[in-house]
Amino acid sequence: MISPVHQVLREGTRDRHETLDHGLALADGDVDRGNYLAYLRALLGWLEPLEERLWQLDWPRELRAPERAGKTTWLYEDLQAAGDTAPIVHCAHPPQVAAPNAYALGVAYVVEGSQLGGRFLAKRLQSTAPELPQRYLRGYEEEVGPLWKAFLLYLDSEAGARDREAQALQGARDAFDSLTGWLRSQGALRA
């Protein structure tokens, strides 16, 4: 059963999510090494400055923030495994998260939800390009389900119980818009 706040975020970002998904060549299995590495570099350029702030906020223990804070490490591992030494350009304007509030949870919804999408892409790439490093796409691996459920429970208890669904939705929309714009500006998203 989907939680009320999750439903608000899912419905309120559906068009943005679809735009992002349809723009990714990876989703079609249309992948070559150069495009894949460019995608990883662009994603890292967006995620690193955001992750540095997002998971350093004063979140309660039940959100398990320290376990969520290593996604940029996985991207660096993939680039290193591929022998990629191209410079990383960082997004100058990722979503601004300043407090552990509903807005930041909306941003985190996009970051954490990408772990579900990454697993889908990893399965697809295993059959079309198994030689490409996929640590980031594998994400939390067997912990993806428990971590996602814990995130949704916290999201619902914080944003839903305090009638802050609109703030969470704005954070999620800003994250999708920022990520899509950044990937497009870096040539990592189809037009």
Predicted regions located by residue number:
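Metal- and O2-centered redox machinery and metal/ROS homeostasis
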Residues: 1-191
